[in-house]
Amino acid sequence: MKERRGFTLIELLVVIAIIAVLIALLLPAVQSAREAARRMQCTNNLKQLALALHNYISATNAAPPGVVNTTTYPGTAPPGSLATWTAWSAQSLLLPYVEQGPLYNAANFKWNCCYTPLTGNNQTNTTVYNTRIASFLCPSDGLAGQQNINSYQGCIGDSTIQYPTGGTTTGIFQVYDPTTVSCQSVTLASLTDGTSNTIAFGEGLVGDYSKNSNYRGNGMSTPSDPSGGIVPTTMPGNNAESNPAAVIQALQGCNAFWQTSATRTCSGYTACCLAGVKQYDGQLWALGERGYTLFNTVVPPNSKQYQWRNCRLSIGGNCPSCAPEGSSFVNAGSFHPGGANFAFADGSVRFIKDSVNMLTYESLGTRGSGEVISSDSY
């Protein structure tokens, strides 16, 4: 009688073990290859934005402003300073230069851009601002598949004031109070630090609407009332690089408040929620506002020490130096390991490590502070 051929149990287990080992060895390599492809796509997206910026400058002789406001509001006008939360973004003006001419033509720039619970009842441009633009999305961000998301933000330098005097920030994109200052923009000639040493756009993580303080794409607003939490007593102003002591003191206050913000319960855009976790950064590419389409170069990308996206400090209370409408740290960040991609004013895209020195990073964001930066410093 012939013996039947087959696998013994031991042989089967050995084969399974070998397959498991191979998978364990190959999976990280596959994941690394996928991330490399996503990072390359992200680099290409930023390259498109940098080229769009140059084409816009060629056509208009100046960079687009970071805030493009109108005082016309269909329906109910936003109350008081909330009118400034309806401004168009620089990205909106760059639409024709990123192959989005039809969308640009569909936008009614005579009306404010967006509807949010803060800004009243404007539905004029709903279709426009809800459109998903693939070149504005980093594929490594898990929220990039949603509509109207924005992963790439314009640089306002190391300015932390909401509306600097005269509307002038230290970066390429200008942020102004439309109730007091006319539209501001800068020319390439004003980039005296050199276009290769000046950041134009950087990556920013998108908030997840979870009020989760453990997610570094979320941020916070601190209350002006000292009883509401630990908040800084000063802010570095329009040039953080010149006041490092104020920067550290303010960042420590933000960190302290971040530890308590998760306990705050609120919903919607209420006063309570504005003094708690902010989870809507990057949610509208059309809105010209810090956190949505603008960032500053104070906290290095993907900081392990300051693990939040945004810290907005309200005026008054124990922060008398905070500017009207607040002052902010708005951090760049990504899901790429080790740092984030940045587009420079010369059209190049470079990867800045999360270990970059804070002063070096601040210098890269400013357009005319006179620093000398070597390429091996970041």
Name each model-derived stretch.
Residues 2-38, 42, 48:
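N-terminal single-pass transmembrane signal-anchor helix
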Residues 32-378:
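Internal low-complexity, small-residue/proline-rich segments
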